[in-house]
A protein has these predicted regions:
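Interfacial segments at transmembrane-helix termini and the short loops linking adjacent helices
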Residues: 106-127, 354, 367-409, 418, ...
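Helix-loop junctions and terminal segments of transmembrane helices
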Residues: 27-31, 59-77, 146, 305, ...
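Signature of the first transmembrane helix
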Residues: 2-66, 93-98, 102-111, 123-126, ...
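Hydrophobic alpha-helical transmembrane segments
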Residues: 121-125, 154-250, 258, 262-266, ...
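Membrane-interface helix-capping segments at transmembrane helix termini in multi-pass transporters
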Residues: 6-7, 38-46, 72-88, 95-132, ...
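Transmembrane helical elements of multi-pass membrane transporters/channels
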Residues: 12-27, 183-202, 214-330, 359-362, ...
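Short runs within selected transmembrane alpha-helices of multi-pass transporters and secretion channels
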Residues: 23, 27-31, 47-54, 58-69, ...
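Membrane-proximal transmembrane or re-entrant/amphipathic helices at the cytosolic face
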Residues: 58, 205-253, 293, 476-494, ...
Length: 566
């Protein structure tokens, strides 16, 4: 198999960053439209309560199965037929989970105003239905991930976001009183788009791949076929499907049992961990929903600020985390000590872990420093004067920038740990996750009573600090047998930290001088200081940038050369 995992991971990260930027820009525009024209209470119902239902169902239904399937496929622990059967379990799992979740969302959580009651009920059922039907696309989505169809994922994800947004905005413009109805309809439509898009691709791809294989036996020069078919059909000798029907359960020939016991054991381990991780990820929304600490209007304010504060996480950190996790699962074996694995792969994984951690930590510090001076102007431009009145949004965004630094470090270190843990280690960590989850919920409730919405952010910082500590200990213990801890090379350099500190002081002086005079000049100072900070980081890490670009070009050239030789 000639596919390159590291190159695919890099491509996936770059394409995903572009997609996340497009997605977040659209979402931010829609949120700003709702805040200015419909009201924050409706935004609180849709973005907090209904999206929490979607997040709960999707995460608990597929996260454990998807992660275990990726690891099992790399280690050749099960057949493709067993993987497909396992992936289709997500449909009945999602349906089963939807029943109690709907009852809780409709009867147990704090009630919405009577004027929105019917729309809210429809929205809950629409979210549940969209999640269930979306699970039917897990099989082709997984195949695309394994065989590195990076552009397919980005195109389909971008397309369904545009379709969902277009339908939602069109309905709201026609009648802004049915915004929640529009939200539910748009969610169902986007789920259908995901299903149709993924299956349609393989409906056309598989027949062309079969013709490509037939012609490949008759020609000596693969360049002729590349000009005719393109590169997406090369190095696909291990693609197991000859019909789109084989992506359905029980259709692909299977000499063994329907399900793999080792895979199911790994699924159970990830499932226990997934429940706890979901509580940690969406804990503040669960607290807001279960206990009426904040009104829907205040929930919307927190959600808007939280999303804005998570720009770096959504644009950069999450795509890098996903690609890094995929790379580590394909490079490092879970059940074999590092000393017994191929040392070139271990060294490469060590370098990737160190460089990626250093990069995201530097980005997090950049966001923290500049948020102290630019939280107010950014929120004013986004939501208007009424939105920032009272100072709560600005205060939340400044505190949230602290969480970004911890989020950056936690995402990579924890991702590496999850990618290389054995089933036993995952089970052990689940006990710690249980402790972290309970502590996080208790801290969220208590700190919110003391500090208001800021308490959610402080509780999240404490939680991530606990998780970072555990991950750092794991990485150090694992690499002790093969060399130095790669995380020791992940701290930003003194030049970058010094320039960043000076720029932070200059921006605070700019804020004090230009406050109420000229936002434009204040923003210009920020742009110049950001450029200086990025330039100092690039200069200090110039060897890293050269190595990364050289390695990327070399691997890309090796793939092209090997393809030409075939």
């Amino acid at each position: 198999m000639g596919r390159n995992v590291l190159l695919s991971s890099l491509q996936n990260a770059s394409f995903s960053i572009v997609f996340q930027i497009i997605c977040r820009c659209i979402t931010f525009a829609i949120n700003a439209f709702i805040v200015r024209n419909v009201g924050r209470e409706v935004l609180g119902i849709t973005n907090v309560r209904l999206l929490l239902l979607e997040s709960t169902l999707l995460f608990l239904s597929k996260e454990a199965i998807q992660r275990s399937a990726l690891s099992s496929r790399h280690n050749k622990q099960c057949t493709w037929a067993q993987l497909i059967n396992q992936l289709w379990i997500t449909v009945p799992v999602c349906f089963t989970l939807a029943i109690p979740c709907l009852y809780i969302w409709l009867h147990w959580l704090s009630a919405v105003d009577a004027v929105y009651a019917e729309q809210y009920r429809f929205g809950c059922f629409a979210i549940a239905f969209s999640c269930i039907i979306e699970m039917t696309a897990e099989s082709p989505i997984f195949v695309g991930q394994v065989f590195c169809f990076v552009k397919l994922k980005v195109i389909l994800d971008t397309g369904h976001i545009f379709i969902r947004s277009f339908i939602f905005i069109t309905i709201v413009l026609l009648n802004k009183d049915i915004t929640i109805y529009a939200f539910g309809i748009a969610q169902i439509t986007s789920a259908c788009t995901i299903i149709v898009g993924n299956y349609a691709f393989y409906y056309f791809y598989i027949p062309r791949l079969l013709r490509y294989r037939d012609e490949l036996k008759k020609v000596d020069d693969k360049r002729v076929l590349r000009e005719k078919y393109g590169q997406q059909y090369e190095n696909m000798e291990d693609f197991p499907f000859v019909s789109i029907r084989q992506m359905l359960p029980g259709v692909l020939p299977n000499p063994g049992s329907m399900f793999n016991s080792d895979l199911q054991t790994l699924v159970l381990s990830f499932a226990k961990q997934g429940i706890l991780k979901q509580v940690l990820t969406e804990g503040e929304k669960y607290v807001m929903s279960v206990s009426p600490v904040l009104t829907f209007s205040e929930q919307a304010t927190y959600d808007v600020v939280n999303n804005m504060g998570s720009l770096a996480a959504r644009f950069i950190f999450r795509p890098i985390e996903d690609s890094s996790y995929f790379y580590f699962t394909q490079s490092i074996s879970r059940d074999t000590p590092l000393a017994e694995q191929r040392q070139s792969a271990v060294q490469e994984a060590s370098d990737v872990l160190a460089y990626v951690t250093k990069t995201v930590t530097s980005i997090g510090l950049l966001a923290f420093v500049f948020a102290q001076s630019y939280a107010g102007p950014v929120l004013l431009l986004y939501g208007g004067a009424d939105f920032v009145e009272g100072g709560l949004p600005e205060l939340l965004l400044r505190w949230h920038s602290l969480a970004i630094v911890l989020l950056a470090l936690n995402g990579i270190t924890e991702g590496y740990m999850f990618a290389t843990n054995t089933s036993r280690q995952i089970d052990t960590y689940n006990y710690y996750m249980a402790f972290f989850s309970v502590t996080f919920l208790l801290l969220s409730y208590q700190l919110t009573n003391w500090f208001g919405p800021v308490g959610f952010i402080l509780a999240n910082c404490c939680n991530m600090s606990f998780r970072i500590g555990y991950s750092v200990f794991y990485v150090g213990k694992q690499f002790r047998q093969v060399g130095p801890n790669p995380l020791l090379r992940s701290l930003p350099g003194p030049l970058y930290l010094s320039v960043l500190g000076v720029c932070g002081v200059l921006c605070k002086l700019s804020e004090a001088y230009f406050a109420g005079r000229s936002i434009l000049w204040h923003l210009l100072v920020g742009v110049l200081c950001t450029a200086a900070s990025v330039a100092s980081w690039s200069f200090e890490n110039r060897q890293l940038l050269r190595t990364g670009m050289a390695r990327y070009r070399a691997r890309k050239q090796s793939i092209t050369t090997s393809a030409d030789e075939r």
